[in-house]
UniProtKB/Swiss-Prot annotation:
Fe cation 2 binds at D48, N79, H150, H189. Binds 2 Fe(2+) ions per subunit. Keywords: Hydrolase, Iron, Metal-binding, Nucleotide-binding. It comes from Parasynechococcus marenigrum (strain WH8102). One of its GO terms (molecular function) is metal ion binding. Fe cation 1 binds at D8, H10, D48, H191. Disulfide bonds: none annotated. Its cofactor is Fe(2+). This is Probable cyclic nucleotide phosphodiesterase SYNW0868. InterPro entries: Calcineurin-like_PHP_ApaH, CNP_phosphodiesterase-III, Metallo-depent_PP-like. Belongs to the cyclic nucleotide phosphodiesterase class-III family. AMP binds at H10, D48, N79, H80, H191. Transmembrane segments: none annotated. SUPFAM superfamilies: Metallo-dependent phosphatases.
Length: 253
């Protein structure tokens, strides 16, 4: 089962508008087109979907997804999002966090780390309790598990981004680390490739995703040597339950 992860498109209501000096809509359109070459079974966009948190921005996101994608879609809110508006506009057609998806025997749990008025992330006690109850389901607990959220669940070594990661990351780690079926935790927010682990679970990769819009100063070298290009990530759960992953990059024009 293949998951195409894209992140941080920062769309706005105006089709041709520049965001951070780049054409956000055109770049996400390109990312979806390039990503389909990998033949994913699910598309995940891990937050900061709509820079201006507008109805029009989410409508345009839906149109792009309808144009390019014919597999299940998971959408995560980031700090540059309005989770309620996202759900109102796109929640009937696509899966919005918090939610659980099972695709071809793989379990994907989507978390909402948005906290109103704050750049840092927060899951909160109610969502953490929901997560704990979901993971305890005896009928599903042995399925390969991928957990996705917008904010990094660990410090990545970046002086700015580490001030706005997930504030309740210790509570999340305490819930996730005991689960033998956990294969990966994936996130956005940092606009760059990043690969780390928890010391307690060195077998579980913690994976940051490049942005479809533009990159921030990188902590780790890009495996493809293209740190400035838009990109994404492809994850594959194999028939034996093992996971492989790779960074994807493409030209911005």
């Amino acid at each position: 089962m293949r998951i195409l992860q894209l992140s941080d498109p920062h769309l706005v209501a105006a089709d041709a508008a520049l965001v951070r000096e780049r054409p956000a809509m055109t770049l996400l359109d390109r990312a979806l087109l390039e990503g389909q070459r990998s033949h994913p079974d699910l598309v995940l966009i891990s937050g900061d979907l709509c820079q201006d948190e507008s109805w029009g921005g989410y409508v345009r996101l839906g149109r792009l997804l309808d144009r390019h994608v014919n597999v299940p879609v998971g959408l995560l809110p980031g700090n540059h999002d309005d989770p309620l508006l996202l759900k109102a506009v796109l929640g009937r057609r696509f899966c919005t966090a918090p939610a659980e998806l099972i695709v071809q025997g793989t379990r994907l749990v989507l978390l909402n780390s948005h906290r109103s008025g704050c750049s840092a992330g927060w899951l909160g006690p109610h969502q953490l309790q929901w997560l704990q109850e979901r993971l305890a389901d005896p009928l599903r607990r042995d399925l390969p598990l991928v957990v996705a959220l917008h904010h990094p669940p660990v410090a990545i070594g970046h002086p700015v981004m580490d001030t706005m990661n997930l504030s309740d990351h210790h509570q999340l780690a305490a819930i996730l680390q005991p689960h033998a079926a956990l294969r990966a935790v994936v996130f956005g927010h940092i606009h760059q490739h990043w690969h780390g682990t928890w010391p307690q679970r060195p077998d579980v990769p913690l994976l940051g995703c490049p942005s479809t819009l533009r990159s921030f100063q990188c902590v780790q070298p890009c495996p493809l040597g293209r740190a400035e290009d838009p990109g994404g990530r492809l994850l594959e759960i194999h028939n034996d339950g093992s996971l492989s992953h790779q960074v994807l990059r493409w030209s911005p024009c």
